[in-house]
A protein has these predicted regions:
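Catalytic center-proximal scaffold of phosphoryl-transfer enzymes
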Residues: 32-423
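Basic, low-complexity segments
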Residues: 1-56
Length: 423
């Protein structure tokens, strides 16, 4: 007996109304009371709500449809379900279900409880980036783009990620052979033969920082950078940012990324992605020494090495580039423009120091999210989205990527495990 299955003031009961509910085992005929008259937007069926029926589907089927529709185009998902499980559901119905539940997934992704504690010495990372998604024409009206007609064809989806790094004692210390304690050799008697001078110990490779398993949380949003920044900050707080020893913000050279960091993470150590910086070194050497020339390649390799491995490497690169500039002309103007990238971001390019502290210097985690969370589903051939539809898909994909999909369904439909897994 459903406790809410009774008439409320102003309602009229249509007793035993028949409803067909789709399940993992096929359609089911469900007779239940249906109440109208109080809500002008529609009636209510308390038994449907009690059983977790959503868009005419049982919880077990709805869970499967959401997962399939988030991973594949809707018609492909429909075909896969038909082939793998003999489940005959149209692609449009999968789309409607995702439109219904997508906002719930989004709220769930931003409301996970913070950990009780973080291990001592934990470093907390925040990364942000953006990627364009093809959208319908009405979504780009009045927006300028990079095409010949000046009309935008895409809308930017902001992608953020937070994660923690394993404590230093769980990682190999950086350059331990050079910076660690000296080894004390035993003293020899005068009558003992003196050993040959041993070769210097091989220089240890820089320690590779590693993420704590299960700590990565993705967030996506079509909102402007200021709103997205507050969403990302809230997610970081929920995941224990305030408990970390150090907060690091990693990003590329986009102006909105650093403005977001300045406003929402003013206490963080800012690091510009090394691989973006290396690309700009390549552009600079092409300007100064010619495209695809041996001299340009040689200088690029040398300057990238300086930038990454030498203390004050960015200052050395700037100095060498200025020495290589001609006194006047077009090449000088282009080189000065390219060099401004390094001068403006000098304080975020102390890569030797970052590596000595065992920190990440690349924003590969968020760039991987741009491809795996957004690109693989929303940027396939022939796709054009409205923003709400894209956002609903991404909400589910973030929950999947964060490994919270089962938790979402357990929270939405609490009850015995056998009942949750039922049709």
């Amino acid at each position: 007996m459903c406790p809410t299955d009774q008439t409320r003031p102003g309602e009229h009961c249509h007793a035993r109304r028949l409803n067909t509910v789709e399940s993992l085992f096929g359609p089911l005929a469900l007779r239940r009371n249906y109440y109208t008259g109080r809500d002008p937007s529609g009636g209510r069926a308390p038994l449907d709500q009690s059983l977790g029926v959503v868009e005419g589907c049982t919880p077990g089927l709805a869970r499967l449809l959401c997962r399939a529709g988030a991973l594949e185009p809707f018609e492909d998902a429909s075909q896969s379900l038909r082939e793998y499980g003999a489940i005959d559901i149209e692609g449009r119905r999968i789309q409607r279900l995702i439109q219904k539940l997508g906002p719930e997934f989004g709220r769930w992704n931003q409301s996970q409880p913070a950990p009780q504690a973080l291990p001592k010495g934990t470093v907390f990372y925040v990364e942000a980036d953006g990627t364009g998604v093809p959208v319908r024409r009405q979504e780009t009206l009045g927006r300028q783009g990079k095409g010949e007609d000046g009309q935008a064809k895409t809308r930017e989806i902001k992608v953020g990620v937070v994660f923690t790094q394993a404590p230093p004692e769980e990682q190999t210390p950086f350059l331990q052979g050079r910076l660690g304690p000296a080894k004390i050799l035993p003293r020899l008697r005068p009558d003992q033969p003196q050993p040959a001078t041993p070769p210097p110990p091989p220089e240890q490779e820089p320690a590779r920082p590693s993420r704590v398993a299960g700590s990565t949380r993705y967030l996506t949003s079509p909102d402007p950078a200021p709103e997205f920044g507050h969403q990302l900050r809230d997610l970081a707080r929920q995941q224990g940012m305030a408990l970390a020893k150090l907060v690091v913000f990693l990003g590329d050279g986009a102006a909105w990324v650093w403005e977001l960091a300045r406003v929402c993470f003013p206490f963080a150590l800012l690091i510009l992605d090394f691989f973006h910086a290396a690309e700009h070194v390549g552009l600079l050497t092409e300007i100064l020494f010619g495209k695809d020339t041996p001299e340009a390649k040689q200088h690029r390799e040398m300057w990238v090495h300086l930038l990454k491995n030498q203390e004050q490497g960015v200052d050395q690169v700037i100095l060498l580039a200025r020495q290589a500039m001609p006194q006047r002309g077009k090449v000088r103007r282009q080189a000065q423009k390219a060099l401004a990238y390094f001068e403006n971001n000098r304080d975020k390019m102390r890569y030797w120091e970052y590596q000595a502290r065992g920190l990440f210097i690349g924003s590969g985690v968020v760039e991987a999210g741009c491809k795996s969370v957004v690109g693989q589903r929303l940027k396939q051939s022939g796709m054009f989205w409205n923003l709400s539809g894209a956002e609903n898909i991404l909400n589910i994909r973030c929950v999947l990527e964060n490994d919270h999909f089962n938790q979402f369904w357990n929270k939405r439909f609490p009850g015995p495990e056998a009942l949750k897994a039922a049709a």
